[in-house]
Amino acid sequence: MFGAFVSHRLWSDSGCTTTCITNSIANYVAFGEQIGFPFKSAQVFIAGPRKAVINIQEDDKVELLKMIVKHNLWVVAHGTYLDVPWSRRSAFVTHFIQQELLICKEVGIKGLVLHLGAVEPELIVEGLKKIKPVEGVVIYLETPHNKHHTYKYSTMEQIKELFLRIRNTRLKQIGLCIDTAHIWSSGVNISSYNDAGQWLRSLENIHSVIPPSHIMFHLNDAATECGSGIDRHASLFEGMIWKSYSHKIKQSGLYCFVEYITRHQCPAILERNLGSSMQLQTALTAEFTTLKSLLK
């Protein structure tokens, strides 16, 4: 279930004006076939990202659904950076998130990723209760990156506490998005196979609370030190999490994550947004070649 973030800025044909998301996905699928790594998943923006504006047009909706069905892709949308239903602007935000969820349903997108805030679980649950569930579309709560806040949602104790509240409140269609760069930035050492294995075994121990069917990953290395609180992604084995394992990749924490993802068939997205299409495709070619070797 491996794939990447598909930015229409970097993936669509120049001059594209109407069906740019579909065009981007078509080029992305062709690229995967070209490098010998057929993609099973993708992540897109259908709104924003920095403004509460829907940016998928009606023609694009029709063609995107056809594209997703044709290639049997699992696609998730990333919410805008304003999608914080536990904020003081929650009435407007909740309405906008509802629009995004309905569009996801319409075009065959399986989920919407929302950034978790560094706030108490009860506030998050109260915010989620304001959103009407949309059948077939999961809201994935993404692990945040922070250094000083009490609630980081990078430890299994805090993740379990949050999802127990979600389950006990009978909220439906809520999942977890684990960003490896974010949990590293929040102070979790996942560098070695053993370190990552310890964290992932703890995750497996709470599958009764948050099942793997509702877990996805943002598979990113990090350009900053463990516990920095800074969100800066890097290509796999090029950042501070796993670079020291670039010549012994099966001893790395990344290999342990790949094993978990494969064992439980979780979607995993590489989030790269480099300066040019050529830079992006060069980086992704190297990363997916490495992933292919880990999957053997």
Curated annotation (Swiss-Prot):
Which compartments does it reside in? Host nucleus; Host cytoplasm; Virion
Please give the cofactor(s) recorded in the UniProt entry for this protein. Zn(2+)
InterPro entries cross-referenced by the UniProt entry? AP_endonuc_2, AP_endonuc_F2_Zn_BS, Xyl_isomerase-like_sf, Xyl_isomerase-like_TIM-brl
Which residues are Zn(2+) 2-binding?
115, 142, 218
What residues bind Zn(2+) 1, as annotated?
A: 78, 271
pH dependence (UniProt free text): Optimum pH is 6.3.
Biological processes annotated in GO:
base-excision repair
* Induction entry: Expressed in the early phase of the viral replicative cycle and accumulates at later times.
Which superkingdom does the taxonomy of this entry point to? Viruses
Tell me if Oxidoreductase is a UniProt keyword of this record: no
Q: Which PROSITE patterns match?
A: AP_NUCLEASE_F2_3, AP_NUCLEASE_F2_4
Keyword rRNA-binding applies: no
Specify which residues bind Zn(2+) 3 according to the UniProt entry for this protein. Answer: 182, 231, 233
- Mutagenesis / variant outcome for changing residue 20 to A: 6-fold decrease in DNA binding and 2-fold decrease in cleavage activities
EC number(s) on record? 3.1.21.-
- Give me the comment on cofactor binding: Binds 3 Zn(2+) ions.
SUPFAM superfamilies with a match to the protein in the record: Xylose isomerase-like (SSF51658)
Top enzyme category = hydrolase
Q: Which family does it belong to?
A: Belongs to the AP endonuclease 2 family.
* Function summary: Endonuclease that plays a role in DNA repair. Cleaves phosphodiester bonds on the 5' side of apurinic or apyrimidinic sites (AP sites). In addition to endonuclease activity, the ASFV enzyme has a proofreading 3'-5' exonuclease activity that is considerably more efficient in the elimination of a mismatch than in that of a correctly paired base. Displays 3'-phosphatase and 3'-repair diesterase activities. The single nucleotide gaps generated by the AP endonuclease are filled by the viral AP endonuclease and DNA ligase.
Q: What else is known?
A: Consistent with its intracellular location, ASFV encodes its own replicative DNA polymerase and three base excision repair enzymes: a class II AP endonuclease, the repair polymerase Pol X, and an ATP-dependent DNA ligase. During infection, the protein is expressed at early times and accumulates at later times.
Q: What is this protein called?
A: Probable AP endonuclease
